[in-house]
Regions:
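Bacterial N-terminal signal peptides that target proteins for export
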Residues: 1-8
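Bacterial N-terminal signal peptides
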Residues: 9-17
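Sec/Tat signal peptide C-region and signal peptidase I cleavage site
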Residues: 18-23
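Electrostatic cytochrome c docking/interface patches
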Residues: 25-54
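Gly/Gly-Pro-rich "capping" loops immediately C-terminal to redox-active cysteine motifs
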Residues: 41-42, 48, 68-96
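Sequence/structural segment immediately N-terminal to covalent heme-attachment motifs in c-type
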Residues: 45-68, 74, 102-103
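Hydrophobic packing within well-folded, soluble alpha/beta domains
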Residues: 59-62, 97, 123
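C-terminal capping alpha-helices of c-type cytochrome domains
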Residues: 99-102, 106, 112-136
């Protein structure tokens, strides 16, 4: 009887102690220093509108028109594009999002030379609005 209780105790302890590992989101692939980068356009509605135009031109193909990572190119990619409406992406700092847009994240290309710093911040501001529209 003691062996059965010990087995059950170990089984449940192991099962429940490792469950959190699988449910935790992966770390965003930006360096910790990216969190300190401050958004100079935060809360600017004009920049959000400009960001949407840039997003449509450069991001929709992979991330989809609502930012869910379901664009027309997504099925052919080696890993699914980020869902910009997700709590995981929305919980990242503006600096981390800016860093990813700038540096890229394979297979996502870098936009450091394609977009100006202002344009990259505009995209960050637009991504922030996607959480509010994800249920529509």
């Amino acid at each position: 009887m003691i062996k059965i209780k010990t087995f059950l105790l170990l089984f449940f302890f192991t099962a429940f102690s490792t469950t959190g590992v699988y449910s935790q989101a992966k770390k965003f692939p930006s360096p910790p220093s990216a969190d300190a980068i401050k958004n100079p356009l935060k809360g600017d509605g004009t920049s959000t509108t400009a960001g949407k135009l840039i997003y449509v031109k450069y991001c929709v193909t992979c991330h989809g028109d609502k930012g869910k990572g379901d664009g027309i190119a997504a099925p052919g990619l080696p890993k699914r594009p980020a869902d910009h409406t997700s709590s995981f992406v929305q919980s990242q700092t503006d600096g981390a999002l800016y860093w990813i847009i700038s540096a890229g994240n394979n297979p996502m290309p870098t936009y450091k030379k394609t977009l100006t710093p202002t344009q990259r911040w505009q995209v960050v501001n637009y991504i922030r609005t996607l959480a509010n529209t994800s249920k529509k």
